[in-house]
């Protein structure tokens, strides 16, 4: 990365946005694959160690032109990729090198934006993924409506090229990008767009995430601009990206463009309280609006997707619910607004009266039904939640059996420690503990009761019960009230956003 930075810094005055020459640098592909390209992929190039090989990349592009547009059969896809039998290998090599190149200006822009006097200016645009947790802790006192929004995807690939043009001015670079998209779409001409994106995300996930981040940033930049114009609340950080790729200058461009294009639209969204948070493709919009204004926001999103991104989205993709009567699902938690009624006696001079105060709190709960279904699927319990022995693990050693159950139990505990009520979490732990004991008893061909009498059961179960307590006992005394309060309260582990996996049973 330092070599690329030096390359761009030396040419910043004349070629700041020109990345096309980097496509023909062999070390780009060596960095992508973790080894020298000509030693491992093209046998005929053994011993060729030139650092700037124009021949290799030109040969790749030429072979892409010469390939048939027919879809590769299943038998061909199983052949060795590095011997030329799979036609898609050429486009895949170039695309993986392309994403390394295209990320360079954004990385440099991020580092240069934090230098000198501009640090305050750009610091305001930083959006942390950890803002999801303050949303979970928010009491939502002034909010009464919630909208579940699922951002539609995929969009037309040409739209992504146009979005990327705001950032770079290299015409040759975009011609190559269009050619790659055109080749890939024609090669998969018999596949639906949804299936195409699914295949693309598996073949080159890094490139897919970059394009998806670019699309989501464009979508949220427009929304956040309108939100700032129509809301009096301080904007907290809500723009979230998988790889935490931040883009900044687009906001300044939107201020000039959208202020002109949406001058009449803003009058329809005079909403002083809007709360917005997103993770992956799902976002939550919470507001104090009336149903009429919430429907206006709903159709604003639909028109934005259809007119600006050419994505057809049905109105049913956005669901509007009243917070006090509906629970919604976000980040594998069930969220609902809990109302706590308090009666306060007040006295003024000789008159006294009672006041009812309603306090709101966003309640985060463990989705017990979904988790039990997951345990049933993995055969840890039956549909009623009764623990079962894991027969396929009966041939393992005692240490491996206990370690596997501990790992699964730790995953649940780590992910759902932010729940406001731990009863359901303790139930899941109980199922796993008893399933572990039944598995060990089955291995030793004994009943559970006889096995517990013969084995030191307290030492076995101690691993499960003291997991969280041991962590906090290193900070607070074991008899401290602070430890007890933390153990019962909500604890958020920040890394659950990066290791997010709904199937926690198989996630280790």
From Swiss-Prot:
One of its GO terms (molecular function) is RNA binding. One of its GO terms (cellular component) is chloroplast. InterPro entries: Domain_X, Maturase_MatK, Maturase_MatK_N. GO terms for biological process: mRNA processing; RNA splicing; tRNA processing. Pfam families: Intron_maturas2, MatK_N. Its main location: plastid. Signal peptide: none annotated. The keyword Kinase does not apply. It comes from the Eukaryota. Keywords: Chloroplast, mRNA processing, Plastid, RNA-binding, tRNA processing. It is found in: Plastid, Chloroplast. Belongs to the intron maturase 2 family. MatK subfamily. Usually encoded in the trnK tRNA gene intron. Probably assists in splicing its own and other chloroplast group II introns. PANTHER family: MATURASE K (PTHR34811:SF1). This is Maturase K. It comes from Abrus precatorius. The lineage of its organism: Eukaryota, Viridiplantae, Streptophyta, Embryophyta, Tracheophyta. The gene is matK.
């Amino acid at each position: 990365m330092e070599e690329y930075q030096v390359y761009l810094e030396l040419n910043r005055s004349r070629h700041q946005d020109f990345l096309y020459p980097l496509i023909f640098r062999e070390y780009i592909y060596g960095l992508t694959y973790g080894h020298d390209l000509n030693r491992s992929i093209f046998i005929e190039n053994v011993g060729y160690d030139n650092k700037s090989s124009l021949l290799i990349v030109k040969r790749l592009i030429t072979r892409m032109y010469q390939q048939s547009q027919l879809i590769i059969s299943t038998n061909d896809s199983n052949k060795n990729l590095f011997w030329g039998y799979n036609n898609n290998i050429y486009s895949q090599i170039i695309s993986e090198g392309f994403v390394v190149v295209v990320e360079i200006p954004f990385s440099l822009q991020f580092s240069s934006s934090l230098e000198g006097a501009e640090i305050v200016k750009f610091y305001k645009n930083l959006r942390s993924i950890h803002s999801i947790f303050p949303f979970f802790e928010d009491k939502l006192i002034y909010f009464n409506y919630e909208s579940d929004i699922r951002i539609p995807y995929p969009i037309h690939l040409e739209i992504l090229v146009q979005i990327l043009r705001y950032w770079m001015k290299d015409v040759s670079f975009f011609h190559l990008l269009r050619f790659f998209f055109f080749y890939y779409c024609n090669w998969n001409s018999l596949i639906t767009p949804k299936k195409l994106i699914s295949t693309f995300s598996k073949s080159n996930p890094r490139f897919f995430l970059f394009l998806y981040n670019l699309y989501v940033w464009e979508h949220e930049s427009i929304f956040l601009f309108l939100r700032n114009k129509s809301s009096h609340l301080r904007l907290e950080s809500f723009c979230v990206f998988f790889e935490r790729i931040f883009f900044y200058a687009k906001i300044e461009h939107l201020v000039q463009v959208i202020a002109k294009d949406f001058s009449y639209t803003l009058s329809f969204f005079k909403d002083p309280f809007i709360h917005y948070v997103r993770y992956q493709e799902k976002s939550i919009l919470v507001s104090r609006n009336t149903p009429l204004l919430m429907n206006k926001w709903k159709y604003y999103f639909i028109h934005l997707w259809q007119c600006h991104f050419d994505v057809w989205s049905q109105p049913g993709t956005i669901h509007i619910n009243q917070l006090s009567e509906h629970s919604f699902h976000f980040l594998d938690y069930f969220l609902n607004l809990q109302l706590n009624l308090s009666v306060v006696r007040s006295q003024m001079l000789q008159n006294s009266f009672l006041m009812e105060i309603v306090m709101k709190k966003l309640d985060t709960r463990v989705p017990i039904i979904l988790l039990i279904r997951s345990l049933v699927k993995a055969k840890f319990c039956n549909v009623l939640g009764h623990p079962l022995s894991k027969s396929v693990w009966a041939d393992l050693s005692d240490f491996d059996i206990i370690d596997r159950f501990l790992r699964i139990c730790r995953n649940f505990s780590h992910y759902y420690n932010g729940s406001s009520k731990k009863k359901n979490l303790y139930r899941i732990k109980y199922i796993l503990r008893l399933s572990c004991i039944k598995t060990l008893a089955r291995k030793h061909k004994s009943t559970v009761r006889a096995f517990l009498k013969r084995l030191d059961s307290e030492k076995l179960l101690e691993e499960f019960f003291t997991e969280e307590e041991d962590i906090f006992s290193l900070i607070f005394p074991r008899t401290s009230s602070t430890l007890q309060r933390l153990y019962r309260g909500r604890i958020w582990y920040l890394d659950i956003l990066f290791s997010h996996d709904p199937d926690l049973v198989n996630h280790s």
